[in-house]
Curated annotation (Swiss-Prot):
Pfam families: Cyclotide. It comes from Viola biflora. Belongs to the cyclotide family. Bracelet subfamily. SUPFAM superfamilies: Cyclotides. This is Cyclotide vibi-F. The lineage of its organism: Eukaryota, Viridiplantae, Streptophyta, Embryophyta, Tracheophyta.
Length: 31
């Protein structure tokens, strides 16, 4: 929840979810 993964999730889910990232406020974050 604190480290940006450099990916947005406005229209599509986080592809970086495979790396432990999740969507928060339209941006993918890790932890």
């Amino acid at each position: 929840g604190t480290i940006p993964c450099g990916e947005s999730c406005v229209f599509i889910p986080c592809l970086t979810s495979a790396l432990g990232c999740s969507c928060k406020s339209k941006v993918c974050y890790k932890n």
